[in-house]
Amino acid sequence: MSKEFIRKLKESKPVVAICYDFDKTLSPDDMQAQGYIQSVGDEVESFWKESNGLAEENDMDQNLAYMFTMIRKAHGKVLFTKKALMDYGAKVQLFPGVETWFKRIREYGVDKGVIVEHYIISSGLKEMIEGTKVANEFEKIYASSFYYDKDGVAQWPAQVINYTSKTQFLFRIEKGTLDVNDSGVNDYFKPEDIRIPFRNMVYIGDSDTDIPCMKLINSYSGHSIGVYNPKTKDKRKVYKMMEDKRIKYYTPADYTEGSELDILVKTIIDTTASNEKLMSIHYQDKQEQISRNGQPDNQEDKEKEKLIMDLENSNSFKQTHSIISKLKKIKSWTLEEKKQLKIIAEKNKQISSIMKDGDVASFYSSLE
């Protein structure tokens, strides 16, 4: 049975999408290290060493490796259910200001005439993120997740997100096709019909796994922000990302009101509000120009425009005769089109030299 996907439609106001990694972007540590690893009697360092070793030895995706390792280590020790993972998520610590950040930034957007939406794009576990205090603040949480049996016990990965696959979700956000199975993400949209252009996206992350998303957003004039732990003040990663042109800005991961990050994101919202007014004027002017010039809006008009261009670029008598035979099949020409055809005949020697040939002469006579 096919599913009918719910899609977000273009708004009457500009929309800014702020996309976040989770671990070490909104939270100071990996989510697995804040309760789960300890509950199975393991050390954080040894867990990741084992998981990464499994990936390396078996040519395995690192995220699939950690998901497999989590299931295996939980066996016989703790229940590995969706509820248990959400309970672990409830214990996850957040950086300063995160709990009030999302509502505050949305309200700032409202004051500026901009809709602000928050999204998670993370290689971490969706179930744990859904257990956090801020889970309901997001339009959509894109993260790795498990398939569960009838008893709610995790059996198999349902979704795995790595650093390269993260980028597909930016296109989903762009077009409003948020469901992971909605093939509408491949549909063509005119630039003016795009729900959230990349220029109106902000990506906030902390490490190499965020680079593909940052690079994509940068290439379309969006905004990429690197964050670092405000307690350790270790800026080595953000310096490297800045040097490699992966980010435009960096700040401490301090989400409190008046912080560097708070001021930066509000400035981006201000800029978006002004820029989208200009883009709106541009699209209005473009539409007026199309209407005034009669730019093709049906198949016959498109065919006429193509043939006129082909005739103008013709570089042989044989090609000219072939194009003329197609032009003769068209019964109606506008005054502007007739003018174009006559100018081409005067300027292109491949036409002017054979104006007395029967087919060419009869075609141009029909334009009088």
Regions found by a protein language model. Name each.
Residues 2-150, 241:
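Alpha-helical substrate-recognition element adjacent to the catalytic core
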Residues 345-351:
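Amphipathic alpha-helical segments within extended alpha-helical solenoids and repeat-rich scaffolds
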Residues 96-119, 123-339, 352-368:
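C-terminal cap/substrate-recognition subdomain and adjoining C-terminal extension
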Residues 52, 325-328, 346:
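Short amphipathic alpha-helical surface patches that mediate protein-protein
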